[in-house]
Amino acid sequence: MTFWSILRQRCWGLVLVVAGVCVITFIISHLIPGDPARLLAGDRASDAIVENIRQQLGLDQPLYVQFYRYVSDLFQGDLGTSIRTGRPVLEELRIFFPATLELAFCALLLALLIGIPLGILSAVWRNRWLDHLVRIMAITGISTPAFWLGLGVVVLFYGHLQILPGGGRLDDWLDPPTHVTGFYLLDALLEGNGEVFFNALQHLILPALTLAFVHLGIVARQIRSAMLEQLSEDYIRIARASGLPGWYIVLCYALPNALIPSITVLGLALGDLLYGAVLTETVFAWPGMGAWVVTSIQELDFPAVMGFAVVVSFAYVLVNLVVDLLYLWIDPRIGRGGGE
């Protein structure tokens, strides 16, 4: 199997996944009890006003007509218009998506910076106290609800210790940096505004740590398993017999090979972080897509909910496509094996 044939296969998979998400999200969103026109008009509005709003939104048409119109607009890059705000969904996503992406990237960075060293040490000190601690962290991270964990760290670090802010991206008295990327940290650096940078960094610590905690243990366990496999290989025994220092063998021989199979897990982690940001943003009043889509669901804003699902699923599949191609580029044997 050539690189281009695998790329073509993965792209078809991307299209099928996004198409499936569109269909499922459309069906589920329209099965939710309630009338968006009634919510938009208010409880005191007459039936004639509600019916007029329903006609303006196209909600009086059959579902297959609404779906056809939605798909047609989607192919033109139009995600529809928010029922709640009256603005294009794509415009709202451009406002809220950078905040979610910044949070997800920082959480992934924390998970890697902490999880990889823990995984290495856990493999080197196998079945010792650190290895058991990492195992407990992994189980705790997977089993602890992000919502509960977020409330816990807010109560501890903001309520009792009062050493970190409990919500938002910036203090109320600070103006956001000039919008370039939508990432406050990066925009503040580009603007040369150190005060905004450090304030945004303080606000990012608690939500990023909360979001990273789940994947920190997973990354550590994945690195540990891959390291143990590499440390048992013959080339490691030869390196030890050659008199090379132990730390040099671990970092320069075992670790690079252990990172290769871990790439797939890291790609999945970034996709999971985008979805996991929904609850985390709600707890920390983080003005990203999570809080926005929760409000949209509560107010039966179908176009906004479907736009969120399409964008996040596309980002998730795209990240995994890049990871698969990177994995193939690093280890071409996968492509040759697939061809056989």
Predicted regions and their residues:
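Residue-level recognition of pore/gate-forming positions within transmembrane alpha-helices
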Residues: 14, 22, 44, 111-112, ...
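Alpha-helical transmembrane segments of integral membrane proteins
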Residues: 2-6, 97-130, 176-340
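Hydrophobic alpha-helical transmembrane segments of membrane transport/permease proteins
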Residues: 17-68, 157-196
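Hydrophobic alpha-helical segments embedded in or immediately adjacent to the lipid bilayer
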Residues: 117-121, 130-180
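Hydrophobic alpha-helical transmembrane segments
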Residues: 42-58, 149-159, 206-211, 248-265
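N-terminal signal-anchor/first transmembrane alpha helix
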Residues: 1-60, 90, 94, 121, ...
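An internal, D/E-rich "acidic patch" concept
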Residues: 3, 60-116
